[in-house]
């Protein structure tokens, strides 16, 4: 009988998924510990394709610039008079301005006098001229102040704050466009078509998107709506009175409002005072006026509040630009509502549903996205709790999923035959679970019967056959990669976004940067492969993936990513394995990595690791390498590298010597150029033919 050491082999004939949290020694054949920038199609592992930069004509620009500064001192303005487009500003004390310097004026009743202006001429130490637009009343009225700066702008070189899709017979024969919302205009892009730019309103005040705004783009019928929500302080109103249709609201402290801005009044017992109103004037620092029906009861009763809001903007697909939706009391009556300011919205069953506040959902009239009935077509979810609505999402059979931060509800809102109100007998609001909720509304994606979403506890998946059992099945879909998700920046998790495409769920999340600091924007892409029923890869890019969109590219449906820096990228495009640089020129190599499961060769004892054999395919110019990672003793070293210097794709069976003693072995496959393919891998080790024995001498 031979006493030679036995050679044993262990390996993987293909690769199906990634499980980084599980003990790598327990992984089944085909599973890997880590896959970075890889695709696991048909059992082979290949580096992903490169991303192509698009839409360079978009002028949204880079992200905002943040500087330390100290504001100048406010100076009272005694008068502003106008002749033509030239206005003369007179101050109560020396202004200190020079020609060309930017002066900020605010507090004028006439909106045209408010804003940043370049000083035209210096008349005296207390007066200078500026150029204004329009024909505002002269002299100006209101409590006006001047601040010499430095200038604090809303945006510095802009950015892209949201992305969506739009198609209509009114635009390019119903071809689909990707819409990118910039700070002062929206851009519509389609492959092969000219860029379409649609500006936001500039009167009575300029409508802009500011950093920190929560922005949504949604199409309802043939109209495109841009909705914004901005954190603004609330004021408890001391009183509201009205005379001949002009309401005057009084605040206990200075409100800072100006004519032309929009304010939401809520809490009054009189429905006529409950809406988003256009501020007509601000006579003093503690009062402002707005229009209401002349028959509204005065004074207001109840506890009323006011807060500034950003009115929804709408574009009808024609040659014009965006406009504000209607404001104030609805023409149909005080109990109806126009479209309120909101950012949580969905479109289903020819109706627009939006969250007006933390627990209330309004439903629009059928085929009319700008008419709402808060009394007869609304519902509340988890009212009275410390929960809040995060997202609304269409579900099966006309139902709507209401995702709160700590719970999930299923709303069935059945309209009466007249289509005007909800039928209470046939409608319901059902709690699916109060154990998990959603922490990022853009992470929700539908895939057939499934709905994917990101929660504080991980990534989950619902379906219409399983939803009622969700309460007893709280294990997240992301459990195999929970350690990787632990790197998410929780302060920015709400910016995460997901989409389903090509049998995969893509989720972009903010994780650590290369320097170890947390990213404030989604920079890492996790991919779940539905065909393999496993996590496939963790992708990294040099640009942020602020919103994922699926649209046409030529004759195919493709996956895009819009970035906060004002760029649009087509993902998985270049076979070269090169990503376009965000800067506008040059490329960088997509570095792929795969770490196999841990090979123990059937025992926990020491072995002689001899070699590895791999079946690989290298395109022309591609380069790859293999590392061995040993356990007990620990080691990490390269065992082979390979470059295809030819002009065509080549198949290889490569062998890498290890020649180390260890208990266990991991193999790391690295790609450094091109898109190499790893088809199968085997490791060999020699094991003692006889078990280890010891001797003991007794006396």
Where are these regions (language model features)?
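Beta-sheet repeat architectures centered on beta-propellers
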Residues: 1-70, 150-200, 204, 208-225, ...
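Small/polar beta-strand repeat architecture
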Residues: 17, 71-154, 204-207, 231-311, ...
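Generic recognition of long tandem-repeat/solenoid scaffolds
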Residues: 85-91, 130, 178, 226, ...
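Hydrophobic/aromatic beta-strand segments within beta-rich folds
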Residues: 89, 100-103, 128, 249, ...
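Predominantly extracellular/luminal cell-surface or secreted proteins
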Residues: 104-108, 131-133, 189-191, 264-268, ...
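Short, surface-exposed terminal/edge motifs of secreted or surface/virion proteins that either
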Residues: 126-133, 185-199, 232-233, 286-294, ...
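Recurrent small/Gly-Pro-centered beta-turn motifs in extracellular repeat architectures
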Residues: 132, 182-183, 228, 292, ...
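Beta-propeller and closely related beta-pinwheel folds
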Residues: 155-161, 198-210, 326-495, 534, ...
